[in-house]
A protein has these predicted regions:
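RNA pseudouridine synthases
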Residues: 1-372
Length: 372
């Protein structure tokens, strides 16, 4: 039996003239496109041919007189695949009554999209989660290093999120909108419903859902900023990825935050800092003296690094596995500690953090920034 009361996570909104105009604009554009520019939409509405150059915003509407359907209005707001499922499950209502896509709609009608309860799809295991953001549709946490996002064979972040949902009465599946490698830290975004997943995935596909990273790479990156566009695919060994003409195109933009020319040998002796100009900008240089005759110094661990390192801010436009790691390795600047892609061993995880995400709130239209 369908429920009659609203829950906090349901979607409620009242149809406005703007919603009607959005449908008319869409119809107007489609008609012009399908008729090689001949404006049959305007003429079918009784608008004289002398006014056929008017914009769709000039078209008048009078609520029901426009003959606008619920399906047409929702189609301007939500992915069609999600709408089909919501209508099949009878979760969409007009003025409190179950609705179909063909139902007529007018200004001031109330639309109610009920969010169905779901069974949690991962074993709930308590974890110390660092929650960065939460609303009715999204849940964003700061993933620590050394934890996988989702794994059937071992404890993963999905188990911790499932426990949080259960503990807070959130009867939802765990839907990850992004993934991070085990050693990558920072923003992990989880959708609380299929509709939210579809809407925010659409933003990711359109690159209006921004994903920003901080990385430390080997060597002095000369360009202040650049866009790395390479085709990538999984290598023959099945372990890592590589730039390959047969792969899918990826885009990784970056800007250099700072550059360091460093000689790091042993932190225990005669360390001092200085500032030098290496031709790009003034950077910190760290010099270390060491007793080369000391048998306790591991010369393989404390290898002299003439190249230094750079800290970069990265924006990811595509979401290929290991994309940032592959891109910087390909240009000769692997992430510090990323031995899989050619970096010197440091004994520490590679330096990559999902620093922030920026997106448009699916209910309010507000731009939201979440920083880890």
């Amino acid at each position: 039996m369908a429920r009659k009361t609203h829950r906090p996570d349901d979607i409620l909104w009242t149809v406005t003239a703007v919603d009607i105009d959005a449908v008319l604009s869409q119809k107007y554009a489609k008609q012009k496109l399908s008729n090689n520019g001949r404006d049959v939409f305007s003429s079918s509405r009784g608008i004289s041919s002398s006014n056929q150059d008017m914009s769709s915003g000039d078209l008048e509407h009078t609520g029901e007189a426009c003959d606008i359907s619920l399906g047409e209005v929702l189609d301007t707001k939500y992915p069609r695949k999600s709408l089909v499922k919501l209508f099949e499950e009878k979760l969409i209502h007009i003025n409190g009554h179950k609705a179909t896509p063909k139902d007529a709609i007018s200004v001031d009608d109330e639309i109610w999209i009920a969010m169905a309860k779901e069974k949690i799809d991962h074993d709930p295991i308590e974890m110390d989660l660092s929650v960065l953001y939460e609303d009715e549709d999204l849940f964003i946490v700061d993933k620590p290093s050394g934890v996988t996002v989702n794994s059937k064979d071992q404890l993963s972040l999905a188990n911790g999120v499932a426990h949080y949902f259960k503990d807070h009465g959130i009867k939802r599946k765990v839907r990850f909108l992004n993934r991070l490698d085990r050693d990558t830290t920072g923003c992990i975004v989880i959708a609380k419903s299929g509709l939210a997943q579809s809407l925010y995935q659409q933003q990711m596909d359109d690159n209006t859902f921004e994903k920003w990273y901080m990385a430390t790479v080997e060597g002095i990156v000369e360009a202040d900023e650049d866009s790395l566009v390479f085709p990538m695919e999984r290598s023959a060994d099945g372990i890592h990825y590589e730039v390959n003409a047969k792969g899918k195109e990826t885009r990784t933009d970056f800007s250099v935050l700072c550059r360091h020319a460093s000689q790091s040998v042993d932190n225990s002796v005669n360390k001092f800092k200085n500032s030098v100009d290496i031709g790009l900008k003034n950077v910190d240089i760290e010099l270390v003296d060491v007793d080369k005759n000391n048998p306790n110094v591991d010369k393989t661990v404390y290898k002299f690094n003439k190249c230094g390192y750079s800290e970069v801010l990265v924006r990811l436009y595509t979401g290929k596995t290991h994309q940032i790691r592959v891109a910087f390795s390909y240009i000769g600047h692997p992430l510090v500690g990323d031995t899989l892609y050619g970096a010197q061993p440091t004994g520490q995880p590679f330096q990559l953090r999902a620093q922030k995400v920026v997106f448009t709130h699916m209910r309010t239209g507000e731009r939201i920034t979440v920083t880890a």
